[in-house]
Amino acid sequence: MLQVYLVRHGETQWNAERRIQGQSDSPLTAKGEQQAMQVATRAKELGITHIISSDLGRTRRTAEIIAQACGCDIIFDSRLRELNMGVLEKRHIDSLTEEEENWRRQLVNGTVDGRIPEGESMQELSDRVNAALESCRDLPQGSRPLLVSHGIALGCLVSTILGLPAWAERRLRLRNCSISRVDYQESLWLASGWVVETAGDISHLDAPALDELQR
């Protein structure tokens, strides 16, 4: 059975400031660096063999810290990037106009073809993150990969594995540097394919972490 671990990046400056990041970027805070070191210690105990990361700066830095602890190289995969939030990226969440807030709500509430101008839909996000996960099945037998990605992207991935719509990600609380695990299994009695073992574990962190509504 293939076990794949999913880690959200450490806290960033814009997480703390409640700015919309999307595929724009801000550096990890000192707290985010500490979170990454704590999740790295946990990852080392798990016997991780491969680290596959979004190529955005905040995930790169988180992955570098984990890789140093695990002694692994990093593979960067743009399919693990966060949802493209278009013209709303870099904006403070409380500064949105009524029209802009409607764009955001249509996107996260699952309105058909909902998207922010110049951004992408939840279905487009789902297609690419699920394709990235599926690529893990091509790794050598006995591999135990860890994917470093983003809150909405990972929430979307876990939701769709559970058979929920992509926009159901908002019902999951995946805090900074939380660990989730999904397994690929072939079983006559249990669900074949990808199953969710755990989601949003933060037992390795020594202080509260921000959730997606606080980014």
Swiss-Prot record:
Q: Which GO terms describe its biological process?
A: glycolytic process
Q: So where's the catalytic machinery, residue-wise?
A: 9, 82
Binding-site positions, substrate: 8-15, 21-22, 58, 60, 82-85, 104-105, 151-152
Quote the Gene3D superfamilies the UniProt record gives.
Answer: Phosphoglycerate mutase-like (3.40.50.1240)
Which UniProt keywords are present, listed alphabetically?
Glycolysis, Isomerase
Q: What is its EC number?
A: 5.4.2.-
What enzyme category does the UniProt record give? isomerase
Which residues carry the site feature described as Transition state stabilizer? 150
Q: Which GO terms describe its molecular function?
A: phosphatase activity; phosphoglycerate mutase activity
Q: Name one GO cellular component term.
A: cytoplasm
Q: Which reaction does it catalyse?
A: (2R)-2-phosphoglycerate = (2R)-3-phosphoglycerate
Involved pathway(s): Carbohydrate degradation; glycolysis; pyruvate from D-glyceraldehyde 3-phosphate: step 3/5
Give the stretches traversing the membrane: none
User: Which Pfam families has this protein been placed in?
Assistant: His_Phos_1
Q: Which family does it belong to?
A: Belongs to the phosphoglycerate mutase family. GpmB subfamily.
Which NCBIfam families does the UniProt entry name for this protein? PRK03482.1
Protein name as catalogued: Probable phosphoglycerate mutase GpmB
